[in-house]
Swiss-Prot record:
Example GO molecular function: DNA binding
Protein name: Plasmid recombination enzyme
Tree of life domain: Bacteria
Family of the protein in this entry: Belongs to the plasmid mobilization pre family.
Pfam families: Mob_Pre
Positions that bind DNA: 45, 113
GO process annotations (BP): DNA recombination
Keyword terms, alphabetized: DNA-binding, Plasmid
Length: 445
């Protein structure tokens, strides 16, 4: 189990103070720090303040009362120390021992940088590893606001050496963190890289979701298109039936018109040649027989009159039969029903076409969003590559400047990156250089 005492410091300007207060006092929920368990935030406590203080107004008041000269707008007004230990060791301590660890750390800071300069000592119990934020104003003994003079490079190196020794004297079994292979929380460049990697992952998830959505929308479009095609086929069949029936109706109208022309509009008397008579001869006893003409009730017609009469009767018979058939099959009603079906299908297809048009528009919009996300992901990846290159350059330049002190400086960087898991790119550059040097050496051999 690692047992490293961890302390690192970061400087802030007045414009940063409000954000520091919000984080320390859990004012609102952080979207970037996923390690915070807000159900445990009630367990957090401040060793110096019973009530929450306002960082900015407190700092301004201290500067007004204690600092001789008015500071510049970009002056460092707050130096915040983060104090903890290796996660395994920290969790092995009881709550009482954890509190004593933080109280001892606070006592160490106050003795070193002044009790009057110490504004807060906020202990966070709601993250992965318990730790404490100690806010110190960099006011010197001669009442100057100068983080540069108070926290020199020599002082920071000494701090990393003295803090573990102090904690051991207080009864804690801890060592200096130099040489640790742990992965740590980065300062500004590393934190930005971590945030960008998280954002890239989130955008990749969104991109995957949008791809799925595009496929689903495409399938819906295909189904809608197939449905509309079937509806169009049905409509065409009904239209053909409608045209066929309309043609039959027109033909029947023509037949009716022909028969109507053959049938008089008004009752007519049939012409005939004469009435048929029968001659009766009555014999008498005396005289001539009596001859009489009696009507039989029949009529005598010519052949032409008979032909005309037959045609009219036949036409009437045909009209009667068609009329009786129409009583059973109402072509008018059938035609009206087909018209209504045709209208309904036309309205349905019109609505489906509108839905299809909307789906095509939605699909194009999703493709545009997907394209934009792809571009943004590429930009973020390029930004990450730039950060990695900057770290590489920083490593090389730092090595040139510090030379003999480089090992101590590298140890300082490691300790300053000791809160949450993130790749230590600075150390990676060192390891890569060692391996490259070893590889060249092996090739020479």
């Amino acid at each position: 189990m690692n047992k490293f005492a961890i302390i690192h410091m970061q400087k802030f300007q007045i414009s940063d103070v409000q954000g520091i207060q919000k984080h320390n006092q859990r004012q609102g929920k952080s979207k970037s720090n996923l390690d915070i368990d807000y159900s445990k935030s009630e367990q957090n406590y401040d060793l110096l303040n019973q009530q929450k203080i306002r960082y900015e107004s407190t700092i301004k008041q201290e500067i007004s009362e204690r600092v001789k000269r008015k500071p510049r707008a970009n002056s460092v007004v707050l130096s915040e120390f983060v104090v903890t230990a290796s996660p395994d060791y920290m969790h092995s301590l009881s709550l009482e021992e954890q509190k004593r660890y933080f109280e001892s750390s606070l006592d160490f800071i106050q003795k070193r940088y002044g009790k009057q300069n110490t504004l807060y000592a906020m202990v966070h119990m709601d993250e992965a590893t318990p730790h404490m934020h100690i806010g110190v104003m960099p006011i010197t003994e001669d009442n100057r606001l100068s983080a540069k003079d108070m926290f020199t490079r020599k002082e920071l190196i000494s701090l990393q050496q003295d803090f573990p020794l102090e904690m051991r004297e207080k009864g804690f079994d801890v060592d200096r963190g130099e040489g640790s292979e742990k992965k740590h929380l980065s300062p500004q460049a590393f934190k930005e890289k971590q945030d960008l990697e998280v954002e890239v992952e989130q955008l990749s998830n969104v991109k995957t979701h949008l791809k799925t959505k595009v496929v689903e929308t495409h399938n819906q479009l295909q189904q809608t298109t197939n449905y509309i095609e079937k509806q169009n086929e049905t409509l065409q069949k009904i239209q053909q039936q409608f045209l066929s029936l309309d043609k039959k109706i027109k033909e029947k109208k023509q037949e009716f018109e022909t028969f109507r022309n053959q049938i008089p509009d008004k009752p007519v008397s049939m012409s005939y040649l004469r009435e048929e008579t029968k001659t009766e001869v009555t014999t008498k006893l005396f005289g001539k027989p009596e001859i009489t003409e009696k009507k039989t009730g029949n009529i005598v017609v010519t052949r032409e009159q008979w032909r005309d009469m037959t045609e009219k009767v036949n036409a009437a018979v045909i009209v009667k039969k068609d009329y009786e058939r129409l009583q059973k099959t109402d072509l008018v009603k059938e035609n009206q029903s087909l018209r209504e079906d045709n209208k309904y299908l036309e309205e349905t297809i019109k609505g489906n076409n509108l839905a299809l048009k909307h789906s095509y528009k939605q699909n194009r919009e999703l493709e545009e969003v997907n394209k934009e996300l792809h571009t943004e992901i590429g930009t973020l990846k390029a930004h990450i590559r730039d950060l990695q290159m900057n770290i590489k350059v920083l490593y090389q330049q730092t090595k040139k400047v510090f030379k003999e002190q480089f090992k101590a400086f590298r140890g300082l960087i490691k300790n300053e990156l000791d809160m949450k898991g993130v790749d230590n790119q600075f150390e990676r550059e060192h390891t890569r250089e060692i391996r490259s040097r070893q590889k060249g050496y092996d090739m020479e051999r």
